Amino acid sequence: VIGSGPSGLAAADQLNQRGHSVTVFEREDRVGGLLMYGIPNMKLEKQIIERKINIMKEEGIEFRTGVNVGKDITAAELLKDFDRVILCCGASNPRDIKAEGRDAKGIYFAVDFLKSTTKALLNGGLTDKNHISAKGKNVMVIGGGDTGNDCVGTSVRPVSYTHLTLPT
């Protein structure tokens, strides 16, 4: 199975339940695709996804992360090593708009913003400073669907962490 987003996980789970040996390839560093990086934690806690993935691993599904199919492994290699290949790679290319100033600094695609923020949060609580931050900025979101609302929520949501050490 190529891709570990919603369709990839569903396909892997169904095939595994029917007795097939299943390997899932994911180009990112974590399994889950859109579920892991595209939906903010305020809507879908990542520990829920991680719990499901751990159950799938215990049931025998193999996950290979950091593998970009087509670059790191060819289609010919996959077809040689596996009986069947299922493409569940989603739509990762953003839809651009033609507007004056579109190429100005500080304009980002929604998926890049959400992925960057979620990845930084998972990697260390936004301490890496490599993510796209909306802190202290005026933010305009074009689009009012789920993705637009996720961007608004991520932009205005204060992220703070308190590390508490309890005496033992």
Where are these regions (language model features)?
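N-terminal Rossmann-like FAD-binding beta1-loop-alpha1 element of flavoenzymes
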Residues: 1-21, 152
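N-terminal Rossmann-like dinucleotide/flavin-binding domain of flavoprotein oxidoreductases
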Residues: 34-84
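Glycine-rich dinucleotide-binding loop and its adjacent helix/turn
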Residues: 54-71, 94-158
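Conserved small/polar residues in nucleotide/adenosyl-binding loops
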Residues: 162-168
